[in-house]
């Protein structure tokens, strides 16, 4: 990518942005993981959880959400100023599941946010350790990406539900910083910008006054983040147009939707990181593993090795399939919701099925669900091979894709052809070629039409045996091309409801 030199690696975003060498980055990421692990151990002690209960992913999610809520300053301020009945703005909590007399019981716990902040800081050598918090946000975002299809959100902003492969990170909170921005898909950025422009259309004071100046700089910053994700000059030029607009309105929304559609073929660079639940880091730390000393990377073999040696359990509803629940969580752990299923099956060593074929609902359990016949089972999170995560979209080409999802956003840097339904994508590009972005539009359409079916992405890159820690012998997988490549294929996944 042309501007690569000006970008920071994600490890630098996760650390303090100073240029560091690989060893320092690994130590620094390891330190963040240590902090999450130590916090988790302490919370399990506070909550008197057994080892098994501490490895239950539902308990992990509750504990993670408690600390994220304790540090959500804007929301905490809002709650102080707008008190609502029955909600204590100073407290946070959630469901904790315990095994009592051979069955699972739900217990609602409540803690002072101040107390949670104290435990978190203590686990992180007195720091706020924002990077650890962001890491947990990205894990939650990856889990949402794997569990839900954002059809409604796409339709509301005037986009097409088939563009779901562009929606990585669509549920990340605004406060997720540079590391969060790096993992957001093209569609997510476009959706945030469209929402902003629509507010400006409906509220004439949105761009005005002191607040309006802040709004404007946020708008331009988001445009620049999106521009940085595009890999062709024409797409970037289009983003310059949108950013420089005096009074953003429907023309800009049109341009944004056009650029999002074009990203189905001319894919943007979106970072992928394997962020694991806190209940994986906790037991590793308590067994004496020193992440800071050993070093850790979110984009290499480390998360695969950690999952090979971890026991994680999950509650299972009466009619759910534990193997399907495992697939859902495995995909979330590797940020792979929009990756080609053929490649995922190869890496995992077991068949990875489309979302609509899975007999499983989300991992979290609603407060009104009956606990009487809840079982629990081990999540199978191991893999046959490992591969390096990518932050590029790979180059383009086409192949039959599906009714639901018509393109992929690669997670792993592994040689393959990238499926997308060219005729479907191109059909959306009839009509509007006039206006000030007409030359860019023409150029983008020309590039899309030139995308060749036989082109291979990530040429020469392969997967590696788990014993090959230094990535010396790439194994280039071969695929059955007749197989379905999209996860959200003509799909019936639940909607994400905030």
From Swiss-Prot:
Composition bias type Basic and acidic residues, residue spans: 8-21
Alphabetical keyword list: Capsid protein, Helical capsid protein, Host nucleus, Host-virus interaction, Ribonucleoprotein, RNA-binding, Viral nucleoprotein, Viral penetration into host nucleus, Virion, Virus entry into host cell
Region (Disordered): 1-21
Single GO term (MF): RNA binding
Main localization (coarse): virion
Keyword RNA-binding included in the entry's annotation: yes
PTM info: Late in virus-infected cells, may be cleaved from a 56-kDa protein to a 53-kDa protein by a cellular caspase. This cleavage might be a marker for the onset of apoptosis in infected cells or have a specific function in virus host interaction.
One GO-annotated biological process of the protein: symbiont entry into host cell
Span of the annotated motif Bipartite nuclear localization signal: 198-216
Compartments where found: Virion; Host nucleus
TM ranges: none
GO cellular component: helical viral capsid; host cell; host cell nucleus; ribonucleoprotein complex; viral nucleocapsid
Position of sequence motif Unconventional nuclear localization signal: 1-18
Task of the protein: Encapsidates the negative strand viral RNA, protecting it from nucleases. The encapsidated genomic RNA is termed the ribonucleoprotein (RNP) and serves as template for transcription and replication. The RNP needs to be localized in the host nucleus to start an infectious cycle, but is too large to diffuse through the nuclear pore complex. NP comprises at least 2 nuclear localization signals that are responsible for the active RNP import into the nucleus through cellular importin alpha/beta pathway.
Family assignment from sequence similarity: Belongs to the influenza viruses nucleoprotein family.
Subunit structure, as described in the record: Homomultimerizes to form the nucleocapsid. May bind host exportin-1/XPO1. Binds to viral genomic RNA. Protein-RNA contacts are mediated by a combination of electrostatic interactions between positively charged residues and the phosphate backbone and planar interactions between aromatic side chains and bases.
Record protein name field: Nucleoprotein
